[in-house]
């Protein structure tokens, strides 16, 4: 069973189609009429628009002619390049386009049974976290007999024109499609999670290791059903569509249609002086201006391969506008990568995506307000919603996506464009369960771009630990909904922090409700004990308060360990000490290296401290070798930290 399906405008495709067939009429959609209001709310029409059905445009109309990816698409006089690029990308993976165009064979024209055609189509979009089915009629806007928006070079193929109309209906009108990015459109067509990679910032041409790591990620994404596109930025409008020295177009988005790591046979190793080739195949949605550099059809490299070589290696091209290029040339020529990961396929096992819908709301009470503005608003910033997640091991890449509810559908009513949004990421205590109130010790682990696009992204390789993500609008005091999605190779247990402090309950009142909150960061342990010169010391920390304990990751083979381990405790009294212990991780029995015992009173200094380790037995126990550096902050205001 697939995901729950929402019916846009509550229109039921099968019922509407049956009614039309019963009455012997073609469907005309009362919720998206063939009128100028369905086209624009601000722009002027360039001519008289006549709405025509496909059979009035072509003698032999079809939804799809042959293979969906075989024909080039044209943006039309009022269309946009991003839409054409997204269509081209969508056509690469059948699992995605068949989701956007459900039961396409059933929706197809059948000349043998014309009575079954009712002029009605349905398409599905991933809209703000829900799969939504949109029903349309087949009336398409034309000027002088030509389609106004996108059309296929196969003049009797209409899937893209009809899909574009359904998308326009979902967003309010055709004008609402203007300004959408290719990542916005692909996410709406597929439900994938997008990441935008700056090729120049990543220095993939300079750093060999990073280049091959990128190839590995792209290969994994593509083979798992992801969609990848790339573009060359143009510094000015005048340079849009200008051809580079190697035949590539600036300002256009190219679709990746294949990616291969090739092992060469003995003869080809001699020819190319390498045992492996890292290759990508790209397609220009316009079907022209192909790559003319190495591995192009006119290149020396290509000519040195026989037809059999190309077939055996998989270096084949099925469409006009397709070409192969090496990973090195790919990294050198393109500036931006749009990587849309397929996160909805259960075949791949592990739960890789976690998501939550939230909202920014306004309240006069600072503890209830959830619209605190960006990081610049230091007094109110932490009044935003807060979400915590856990990275279970070092070195996992985490992709974070924050999407605001698109306001384009309300522009007709005078509502503003999208808000400027972004988010901040903080590494927090390993046992945090309540909201952040001040940032005394937390490490700022990342920040997204702040921009008025629908979606902002951030990808980071994160260390093991807990992280709090704070989604924000740039200005405080605004209200809106948002969708937060986090993708990782391992589950990260995304959840919202809603409470400010421990709840009052019969249980904790009987045991004693907390009166003090204490936050501690252990920065390092240095000069640790070694019994003999070649002994291996693998230190780790435990931070204890009563029955609660936090344990740090193990540091390998060092007597000077950097931990930066954080913990927070809600204590009934300062008579319950905090004990920091250092241990040596060993195969059979861990070795105690020393401890520090702290009262952590609210009146204590909050600066960085350094204390010698001692044996067990309290603050007056015998001193041992080594010392730790730490910072402790205590407060009798449970909502300070």
UniProtKB/Swiss-Prot annotation:
Ranges for domain Calpain catalytic: 26-343
Q: Where is this region: Domain III?
A: 344-495
Keyword Cytoplasm assigned to the entry: answer is yes
Superkingdom to which the source organism belongs: Eukaryota
UniProt record, GO biological process: microtubule bundle formation; regulation of cytoskeleton organization
Question: SMART domains per the record?
Answer: C2 (SM00239), calpain_III (SM00720), CysPc (SM00230)
The UniProt entry, under InterPro entries, shows: C2_Calpain, C2_dom, C2_domain_sf, C2_III, Calpain_cysteine_protease, Calpain_domain_III, Calpain_III, Calpain_III_sf
Subcellular locations according to the entry = Cytoplasm, Perinuclear region; Cytoplasm, Cytoskeleton, Spindle
User: Could you give one GO CC term from the UniProt record?
Assistant: spindle microtubule
**Transcription found in the keyword field:** no
Q: Which UniProt keywords apply?
A: Cytoplasm, Cytoskeleton, Microtubule
In what residue span(s) does the C2 domain sit? 498-621
Record-annotated membrane-spanning stretches: none
An example Gene Ontology molecular-function term: microtubule binding
Predominant subcellular localization, coarse grouping: cytoplasm
Protein's job: Microtubule-stabilizing protein that may be involved in the regulation of microtubule dynamics and cytoskeletal organization. May act as a regulator of RAC1 activity through interaction with ARHGEF2 to control lamellipodial formation and cell mobility. Does not seem to have protease activity as it has lost the active site residues.
Q: How does it assemble?
A: Interacts (via domain III) with microtubules. Interacts (via domain II) with ARHGEF2 (via the N-terminal zinc finger).
Q: What family does the entry list?
A: Belongs to the peptidase C2 family.
Official protein name in the record: Calpain-6
Task: Tell me which species this is from.
Answer: Rattus norvegicus (Rat)
| Organism taxonomic ancestry | Eukaryota, Metazoa, Chordata, Craniata, Vertebrata
Gene symbol here is Capn6
